[in-house]
Amino acid sequence: MSTEASTGETPEFQSYDHRGSPTQEAMKREIQSLIQNLVKLSRTAPAIHVLIPPEIVMYVEGSRNPDIYNREFVETVQRMNQMLKGRSEALQALQAQIAHQLQIAIPEMKDDIERAVEATGGKVPITGITLDP
């Protein structure tokens, strides 16, 4: 049940800083300016080609904030980078371990092993130093 029906009074509306005609004219100018800007925007939009990923469009259409999408995307990329960095470091350690073991097992191939490892960006451990398995 509404307040009007229960009290029998009509609701009151208050306006702050309304100065009659000058306020209406200012509001009219603002609305006209908004309409003109929207018309300009709709005319220039076809000439501007910006590729927006469909995921972001769907995110916005679902009334979600694209800044949150960006933050989640950056966090995902950081996690993946950390994971790949860990894998890369593990493979480098494996390469060094294999090179070290090959140098011990086949000492006459030491120079070839060093060249192969260095050609792939790795470093050969100094012979005589044992690496943890």
Swiss-Prot record:
Keyword match Transcription: yes
Any single biological process term in GO: regulation of transcription by RNA polymerase II
Subcellular location: Nucleus
Domain of life: Eukaryota
Composition-biased stretches (Polar residues): 1-13
GO cellular component: mediator complex
Region feature (Disordered): 1-28
InterPro entries documented for this protein: Mediator_Med10 (IPR019145)
UniProt keyword annotations, A-Z: Activator, Nucleus, Transcription, Transcription regulation
Self-association state and partner proteins as the record states: Component of the Mediator complex.
Protein name per the record: Mediator of RNA polymerase II transcription subunit 10
Provenance organism: Phaeosphaeria nodorum (strain SN15 / ATCC MYA-4574 / FGSC 10173) (Glume blotch fungus)
Gene name of the encoded protein: NUT2
